[in-house]
């Protein structure tokens, strides 16, 4: 990249000596120059000048290349108008020259020497110039075979053009080198030649690189593991110290104080007694549950449903219940309020389980006219029926009035 100073100098030079147009084709605003002659050329003509070789024309870009001070001095010493006027003053100059002939001529060699001498700050004269003895390079001639397939020889012009092309190709090869060395001198370095052992070297370098990466990763892993172990150890020790402190404060110190005060045995005995009472309660409850399950009875008598009224009731346990209501028929037509009585059966005959006595119902006193109060009588209904007119009636007169406890059909108020 051209520096600001370089661009300033080139801008001043462009405004002089017809440098605002291409020296070869006359195109406006040229961006390339031939430093050897100090002339300005366009992009297309710069490619043609590169083909001549650096010994005939050294091409530089106005904006993209770096410039040296000697190159800027050559641009000041040369110029489009100066080079054209110098060529026209030479005896061997011909306007019909080709590009190669023009820059290979003695006149172009003299102007090159003049520009280089003036750029160095020296005086130049035509007589003392070493370019006076300049001989243009001879093109390489083709070696023709003695026997040609065709009888007609090639023309001199065709052979001359072929020789020029061969010479140009050789010159380009010497300047640019091989394909990979084309841009040498433009900031590119020449790559080293490949050898047969490059494959082995590349493999070994890859192996070394992989091993170095592995060692680096292993060292990082080891350092991370060390840090983790250190951190875990510190946390574990901290937790252990906290646990020991808590155990000392909550267990050991209270136990020591109780031992000193003599309360440790009281606490132990109270705890054992509480445990024994809980075990006893749980055991008794479990035994009641087991016995209740196998006996099929309820745990509490209050949980059993009340027995209802029926025509027959022979249960001995019901004789102790004195709060059972009398039925409707037992109090029907009675002027006296109902009284408590011992349980009796509504069946034909019922043995009193509590007293061992038997109470008679309506069949026992059928036809007797009055109820019998002999509770120890073992006669049934048919026996009373037979003695109704005889002994039964006489016995009935001797007995006291029937008790008001006889209800139902035995009541005389019915």
Swiss-Prot record:
Protein localization: Cytoplasm; Golgi apparatus
Residues recorded as bearing Phosphothreonine in the entry: 135, 189, 349
List of residues that carry N6-acetyllysine: 231
Record SMART domains: ArfGap
GO molecular function: GTPase activator activity; zinc ion binding
Basic and acidic residues compositional bias, start-end: 297-307
Domain of life: Eukaryota
Zn finger (C4-type) location: 22-45
Broad class of where this protein is predominantly found: cytoplasm
Ranges of residues in domain Arf-GAP: 7-124
UniProt keywords, alphabetically: Acetylation, Cytoplasm, ER-Golgi transport, Golgi apparatus, GTPase activation, Metal-binding, Phosphoprotein, Protein transport, Transport, Zinc, Zinc-finger
UniProt biased composition (Low complexity): 310-327, 334-347, 362-388
GO annotation, cellular component aspect: Golgi apparatus; postsynaptic density; synapse
GO biological process, alphabetically ordered: protein transport; regulation of endocytosis; vesicle-mediated transport
UniProt subunit comment: Interacts with ARF1. Interacts with the COPI coat proteins, KDELR1 and TMED2. It is probably a component of the COPI coat protein complex. The interaction with TMED2 inhibits the GAP activity.
Domain notes per entry: The region downstream of Arf-GAP domain is essential to GAP activity in vivo. This region may be required for its targeting to Golgi membranes.
Function: GTPase-activating protein (GAP) for the ADP ribosylation factor 1 (ARF1). Involved in membrane trafficking and /or vesicle transport. Promotes hydrolysis of the ARF1-bound GTP and thus, is required for the dissociation of coat proteins from Golgi-derived membranes and vesicles, a prerequisite for vesicle's fusion with target compartment. Probably regulates ARF1-mediated transport via its interaction with the KDELR proteins and TMED2. Overexpression induces the redistribution of the entire Golgi complex to the endoplasmic reticulum, as when ARF1 is deactivated.
Name of protein: ADP-ribosylation factor GTPase-activating protein 1
Species the sequence originates in: Mus musculus (Mouse)
